[in-house]
Design a protein with these regions (language model features):
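N-terminal intrinsically disordered, low-complexity segments enriched in P/E/S/T
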Residues: 1-137
Length: 137
């Protein structure tokens, strides 16, 4: 499966900013396609071993997220966002602190966006597709 690189940064609920960094991984939508895809009305659950879980819509898997200006935190329009399952940050494998072995990242070709940190699931160990007709783990 081909790797994808992009720039992504996020902010936490307490206002800590993680400046955009170079992220490398595989497109989550491509992973979903490997098991018959994600229906338009389906969801993707991303789970970490500590019990943290995020549920993403079909549109989010395709890159539809709110984006914010890194200086003003005002919402700004975006163009080419991708959701990836990241395994490398700034040219190095993820550390435990950064979410080793795998982490969800929201990336773009430009570093002008921040996204909300709760979407950047660390330590991913399971993804579950929930479609109306079937479930894939």
């Amino acid at each position: 499966m081909p790797s994808v690189e992009g720039l992504g940064g996020f902010f936490t609920t307490v206002g800590v900013v993680n400046d955009p960094c170079r992220c490398k991984g595989v497109l989550v939508v491509d992973l979903c396609k490997q098991v018959n895809g994600l229906d338009r009305s389906g969801t993707l659950q991303v789970v970490a071993p500590d019990g943290y879980m995020m549920v993403f819509s079909h549109d989010q898997v395709l890159g539809d997220f709110h984006t914010y200006d890194p200086k003003t935190f005002r919402e700004v329009p975006h163009d080419d966002l991708n959701m990836i399952l990241m395994y490398e940050i700034d040219g190095k494998p993820l550390s435990d602190h950064n979410g080793k072995p795998l982490r969800i990242a929201i990336v773009s070709s430009e570093s002008r966006y921040l996204t909300e940190g709760h979407n950047w699931v660390k330590w991913v160990n399971k993804m579950v597709i929930r479609n109306a007709s079937s479930n894939f783990v």
